[in-house]
Amino acid sequence: MRRVLVAGNWKMHKTPSEARVWFAELKRLLPPLQSEAAVLPAFPILPVAKEVLAETQVGYGAQDVSAHKEGAYTGEVSARMLSDLGCRYAIVGHSERRRYHGETDALVAEKAKRLLEEGITPILCVGEPLEVREKGEAVPYTLRQLRGSLEGVEPPGPEALVIAYEPVWAIGTGKNATPEDAEAMHQEIRKALSERYGEAFASRVRILYGGSVNPKNFADLLSMPNVDGGLVGGASLELESFLALLRIAG
């Protein structure tokens, strides 16, 4: 049985001071969880997360990581640094990193390796833009991205890897794949994982949906057998909507 994961990607929102208030309120209002919750804020907020969320059920992590272990790489943040801050997760391969920073599948794979070396679970993002979907090429495009981003990546177990399917055309647009659309792609992703790591491994990897998830559509998405949670953007910034997602997840 795969445990549902609700992971909030804050992107470049909130200051450390604002996050401290948000975390304190979350801590006060958090219901008992059967599912798993995580918040993924900007790097400067991670020490605040470590301080405030340490004794809660809520995990936290980063939105990116360096492909390098350490060295003269100005502006980079290593997996070892994230580990020292207590990060449980880190996103790699988000469409915004691929689009605005030119990140390739090979670079994403290196980042995933660095995280696994430090015991941090990569949330590895894949997904197609609108023009690819309209051509009917969404599945081969996404699976090619998945295979390239997992090249040489050997997680110690299925719980050490999370995949997030983010249809790029549905991020921040208010558009959303139907639950059936999401399920169809998640099935293809799981099949590709089975070919790569074996069926027993693939059956236990969590695959999140990451395209404009909100409290109105989350229950329907979770009703799909291969949707194991959400990588949530805008709906994770407001405490009430994040709590609503956690209540839906159970």
From Swiss-Prot:
Record keywords, A-Z: Cytoplasm, Gluconeogenesis, Glycolysis, Isomerase
InterPro entries per record: Aldolase_TIM, TIM_sf, TrioseP_Isoase_bac/euk, Triosephosphate_isomerase, Triosephosphate_isomerase_AS
A GO term, aspect molecular function: triose-phosphate isomerase activity
Cellular component GO terms held in the UniProt record: cytosol
Chain sites annotated for binding substrate: 9-11, 172, 212, 233-234
Localisation per UniProt entry: Cytoplasm
EC number(s) stated in the UniProt entry for this protein: 5.3.1.1
One GO process term, biological-process aspect: glyceraldehyde-3-phosphate biosynthetic process
Known catalytic reactions: D-glyceraldehyde 3-phosphate = dihydroxyacetone phosphate
Major enzyme class: isomerase
Family matches, as HAMAP family: TIM_B
Family that this chain belongs to: Belongs to the triosephosphate isomerase family.
Function field: Involved in the gluconeogenesis. Catalyzes stereospecifically the conversion of dihydroxyacetone phosphate (DHAP) to D-glyceraldehyde-3-phosphate (G3P).
UniProt protein name: Triosephosphate isomerase
